[in-house]
Curated annotation (Swiss-Prot):
The protein's name in its UniProt record: Acetylcholine receptor subunit beta
Annotated Gene Ontology cellular component terms: postsynaptic membrane
Origin superkingdom: Eukaryota
Principal cellular location given in the protein's record: membrane
Keywords tagged on the record: Cell membrane, Ion channel, Ion transport, Ligand-gated ion channel, Membrane, Postsynaptic cell membrane, Receptor, Synapse, Transmembrane, Transport
Topology term for the membrane: Multi-pass membrane protein
Length: 24
């Protein structure tokens, strides 16, 4: 689901900070 994708994306970026620049 879209919500699950968002959660997984957050977890992924949390462990891979280089994947996406800090948004905040």
């Amino acid at each position: 689901s879209e919500a699950e994708n968002d959660l997984m994306n957050k977890l992924f970026t949390a462990y891979n900070p280089k994947v996406r620049p800090a948004e905040k």
